[in-house]
Amino acid sequence: MLQIGEDVDYLLIPREVRLAGGVWRVISKPATKEAEFRERLTQFLEEEGRTLEDVARIMEKSTPHPPQPPKKPKEPRVRRRVQQMVTPPPRLVVGTYDSSNASDSEFSDFETSRDKSRQGPRRGKKVRKMPVSYLGSKFLGSDLESEDDEELVEAFLRRQEKQPSAPPARRRVNLPVPMFEDNLGPQLSKADRWREYVSQVSWGKLKRRVKGWAPRAGPGVGEARLASTAVESAGVSSAPEGTSPGDRLGNAGDVCVPQASPRRWRPKINWASFRRRRKEQTAPTGQGADIEADQGGEAADSQREEAIADQREGAAGNQRAGAPADQGAEAADNQREEAADNQRAGAPAEEGAEAADNQREEAADNQRAEAPADQRSQGTDNHREEAADNQRAEAPADQGSEVTDNQREEAVHDQRERAPAVQGADNQRAQARAGQRAEAAHNQRAGAPGIQEAEVSAAQGTTGTAPGARARKQVKTVRFQTPGRFSWFCKRRRAFWHTPRLPTLPKRVPRAGEARNLRVLRAEARAEAEQGEQEDQL
């Protein structure tokens, strides 16, 4: 008997419910008809000082059990593993059933019991169902006769041609379904993918992601410089080397659209070959590794850039025609911008000044220029090719002037080596007036795989460390060098822990009274072991 709340749809209430005793029939009336009855009932009960529960209890007591024929003990069925539940005497359930209750588990499984009862008339015996939680499988606890037995037998016979069972329905978590487009465009290279990724990641995160990231300290150049380093270390090597950070930043947004789709072949350069190449180059010019520290990495950078870029341009012949002297001249140009005052004098220096001017102009131009293609054509070459070509085109006299420049530059280096403090100051000044010069150097360095190393050395140069001192790689020490380190190597381990062991001597040192012969001890131990074995056998 259910008491129905006002807002319940009467049709939602199940006709029968599987509960403890078996299947219970549910009697309910629509609320409207019953309202008066309920009111009268409650009123009466209030007057009597009773509650609904009391009524239920009394009715329960007054209902006699339906007479049950004594069950004849039939031989135990092997199939039933679940103990049949002891059925309590039928009770009158006084429950309230309204929309808050509507989804209750035991009520909502009334569909199952309904379709069972639909099989209908041929079933003589009332079926007792187990609550679902006790019912292992469909067949496990089923106590039903006849048709279920037939089903069982059929299932047993059918078990050979078992259909591949569908895996149990699992609760699905909605994962994003990967979409595969069929029109795979040109596959992005690793660099391009990284570039695309970089363009979407915020600058702070990027800083955290790029290992060994260290900006070059420099007052004048601030944010633009930082951003350009970011883009570089993100590997924007395809951005034209001549461009200044200004428009390289402009490009960084659309970098992920690979501009140079016909990518030219670049030799793969790993660190070893890179260092070797740098050694070969710095050695003949006679400027050791110190240049790199002195000049804030600039001269060495331009050279290193040359090395890589000229492999890259395929203009190797034309570049090396100038030989070391040519590169030296370029380094000198770099320096000439730092200390342009002392180098303006004299007819030979005149031409060099022209080259330097040319460089400075180009840099400024590039800063203004917008068209990336045009940047790529002149930008990449302008520092390198044009300076060099101008020098080479003028007359053979150039060679002489270059050589003198070279020497003068080395002289300057030597002076600087003697006074590292001065060099620090120099560098500071150079960086202060760095505007274009630093940018030019940056751009030359854009493609160099040595970015990080160059930056380290540059930073050293800035702080004014001694020129010879270069960033050393820290040596890892072997942690435990104790003599026992390899002892495991020679020890015989027992392969099987379970095999009986030979008896071992007691660990503690025997006290003075006990200090007996080792032989005696051993004999005792052996006797004990044997006794143990005998006991085991017994």
UniProtKB/Swiss-Prot annotation:
Short motif PxLPxI/L motif, span: 500-506
Positions of modified residues (Phosphoserine): 142, 146, 261
Residue ranges with Low complexity bias: 321-332, 428-438, 458-469
Tissue expression profile of the protein: Widely expressed with low levels in spleen, skeletal muscle, small intestine, kidney and liver.
Record region (Disordered): 58-128, 213-473
One Gene Ontology biological process: microtubule cytoskeleton organization
Compositional bias annotation for Basic residues: 119-128
UniProt subcellular location: Cytoplasm; Cytoplasm, Cytoskeleton, Microtubule organizing center, Centrosome
Outcome reported for the amino acid change (mutating residue 503 to A): Decreased interaction with ANKRA2
A GO cellular-component term linked to this record: cytosol
Biased composition (Basic and acidic residues): 301-313, 357-373, 381-392, 405-419
Coiled coil: 349-366, 514-535
Keyword list, A-Z: Coiled coil, Cytoplasm, Cytoskeleton, Dwarfism, Phosphoprotein
Metal-binding as UniProt keyword: no
InterPro entries in alphabetical order: Coiled-coil_p8 (IPR026526)
Assembly behavior: Component of the 3M complex, composed of core components CUL7, CCDC8 and OBSL1. Interacts (via PxLPxI/L motif) with ANKRA2 (via ankyrin repeats); may link the 3M complex to histone deacetylases including HDAC4 and HDAC5.
Primary role: Core component of the 3M complex, a complex required to regulate microtubule dynamics and genome integrity. It is unclear how the 3M complex regulates microtubules, it could act by controlling the level of a microtubule stabilizer. Required for localization of CUL7 to the centrosome.
Domain remark text: The PxLPxI/L motif mediates interaction with ankyrin repeats of ANKRA2.
Name of the protein this chain belongs to: Coiled-coil domain-containing protein 8
Lineage, broadest ranks: Eukaryota, Metazoa, Chordata, Craniata, Vertebrata
Gene: CCDC8
